[in-house]
C-alpha cells in the first residue's frame, strides 16, 4: 500500500484538518467513531482508502494523521468534538504555551521542547505503514507555530525520511485581511527554511477564499468553517486519486514529476470548479467543458494573482465524478485554442489529466451544492510570483525600520537570518522571472558580447 501521513500544525492546520477528516469520513462511509456505516458499506469496494486510514483489530478506522499545536485550545476542540473517538489520543499533541505569532518561538524556543515527542508519534505512524509514500503537511505561513514549528519539523523529517515526498498545504497571508502584523516576517522565514525540504507546496490565500464564499456561495460574512470546508474539498480532490481507484490515477510523486520543472519552482496554483451554492446548482447544467473553462478564470483561484499575465509551465487537471476522457479532450482542446492562456515555449503540451469516478461528496448542511462532476486544476504558473512580490514588499517596509525584530532576536534568532531569508526569496522571484522568459531570446543575447 502507498500510505500518506497527514501532519496538521498550528491553529490553521488543525482546523483545516478537522474539515478534511470530516469530509474523508463521509466519502468513505466511516462514522465519527471510526466504524463503517452499514448503509455506506457499498462505497468501499476497493481498499484504496487505507492509504489514509489504518484499520485496528476491532474494525475501527483511524486516520493516519497527527495534529500538533503549541497551545492546547484548538486541539482541545478536537478532543471534545464530534470526531473525538476517531483519533488516537496520542495523535493529538499540544504544548503548554503558544508560539505567540513568533516564528522564532515556534522554531527555536518553544518548538524545540515538543519536536522529539512529535517525531516519536510520527515514527509510530510510519511503523504501521507497509510502503510509506510521503507526508502531507497542513499549516499557515503567518502564525508562529504554523511557520516556525513546521519548518523545524520539515528539517527533521528530511533527516529521518530523506527520500519520502513532502507536500505542503499552506495558508498564505491574504493581501488585505491580516490576522497578525508580523505575518510577512513569519512567511518569509518559513519559506526560506522549508524551500529545500518541501517537494510541492499548494498555497491557499484566505482572501481569495473569502471572495469565493461571498461571490459564488452568497455567504455575506464567511467564517473559518466556511473557508475550511471549501479548502477541504480541494484537498479531497487532490488526494482522491490516492484514496479511490480511478481510470487515470495520480500518485503523490506523479504530481511532482508533472508539476515541478525545477526543484525551487514548486508552488502550483490551485483552482477548483464548480463552486456553487445549492440554489444556483438547481438551475445550471455544469458540463465538463464549462467547469474546465471556469478553472482558467482568476476568480476560481485559491491565490490572488493573475495567470493571464503569467505563463503556464505545467497543468494538472483532476476530474472526479461523471467524466469521460472524450469530454475532457474536447474541453482541453477548446482551452488550447484560446489565446489568453500562454504556455512557456519550452513546455508546449503541458496538460496532465486524472479522472476519478467517485463524485464529490458534500458535508450535510454545508454551503456547496452536491454536483455530479468537479475538477481541480493544479497549474504551475509564473503568475504566482506576484504573491511573493507582495509579501516581500511588506517585509521590506517593516524590516527597513527593524520593526518587531527584537521579539525574534530575543528568542535566540540572529538578525542575519532575516536578510538571508529575504535574499533567498528575492532569488525565488528571480527564478520565476527567468523561467518565464522565452528561450530564443536568451540565445540572441549571447551574441552581443
From Swiss-Prot:
Active-site residues, Swiss-Prot/TrEMBL: 254
Main subcellular localisation: cytoplasm
Residues that, per the record, bind Mg(2+): 71
GO BP: microtubule cytoskeleton organization; mitotic cell cycle; spermatid development
Coiled-coil boundaries: none
Entry's EC annotation: 3.6.5.-
List of residues binding GTP: 11, 71, 140, 144-145, 179, 206, 228
GO molecular function: GTP binding; hydrolase activity; metal ion binding; structural constituent of cytoskeleton
Consequence the record notes for mutating residue 214 to C: In MACTHC2; uncertain significance
Post-translational modification: Some glutamate residues at the C-terminus are polyglutamylated, resulting in polyglutamate chains on the gamma-carboxyl group. Polyglutamylation plays a key role in microtubule severing by spastin (SPAST). SPAST preferentially recognizes and acts on microtubules decorated with short polyglutamate tails: severing activity by SPAST increases as the number of glutamates per tubulin rises from one to eight, but decreases beyond this glutamylation threshold. Glutamylation is also involved in cilia motility. Some glutamate residues at the C-terminus are monoglycylated but not polyglycylated due to the absence of functional TTLL10 in human. Monoglycylation is mainly limited to tubulin incorporated into cilia and flagella axonemes, which is required for their stability and maintenance. Flagella glycylation controls sperm motility. Both polyglutamylation and monoglycylation can coexist on the same protein on adjacent residues, and lowering glycylation levels increases polyglutamylation, and reciprocally.
GO cellular component: acrosomal vesicle; cytoplasm; microtubule; microtubule cytoskeleton
Record InterPro entries: Alpha_tubulin, Tub_FtsZ_C, Tubulin, Tubulin/FtsZ-like_C, Tubulin/FtsZ_2-layer-sand-dom, Tubulin/FtsZ_GTPase_sf, Tubulin_C, Tubulin_CS
UniProt keyword annotations, A-Z: Cytoplasm, Cytoskeleton, GTP-binding, Hydrolase, Magnesium, Metal-binding, Microtubule, Nucleotide-binding
Pathological condition linked to this protein in its record: Macrothrombocytopenia, isolated, 2, autosomal dominant: A congenital blood disorder characterized by increased platelet size and decreased number of circulating platelets. Affected individuals usually are asymptomatic and do not have increased bleeding episodes.
Function text: Tubulin is the major constituent of microtubules, a cylinder consisting of laterally associated linear protofilaments composed of alpha- and beta-tubulin heterodimers. Microtubules grow by the addition of GTP-tubulin dimers to the microtubule end, where a stabilizing cap forms. Below the cap, tubulin dimers are in GDP-bound state, owing to GTPase activity of alpha-tubulin.
Additional information: This tubulin does not have a C-terminal tyrosine; however, its C-terminal phenylalanine residue can be cleaved.
Name this protein carries in UniProt: Tubulin alpha-8 chain
